[in-house]
Amino acid sequence: MFRRILEIFKKGESEELDSQEKFLVGKVRVEGKLRVGPWDAVICEVEEGIVKIGYKLKKGRKKVPIMKIQKERKDIEFAIPGDKVALILDGSIEVESGEVLKIYST
């Protein structure tokens, strides 16, 4: 299990980004969006890479930090390909079902 996670981390692609963003570490396919208290939650399935708390979800030029990740209503530290999760965001982003969004490390 840990070996697979390390392989996923090593696959991160380097792209020209601002000083806050360094690596593309994953992609998620959006299934929906909810409001959880004062925050937005994006329901999605991880397609590639790894998603961790503190990483940023990016659509176009807008990037929003991931504040919390939940799987089956339990908080988790990270998600890997195949996981269906809710990404609780520290901000708002407009998404549509079926969209593929990128995840960047900081």
Q: What are these language model-derived features?
A:
Residues 2-50, 56-106:
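Beta-strand/loop-dominated core regions that host nucleotide or nucleotide-derived cofactor-binding catalytic loops
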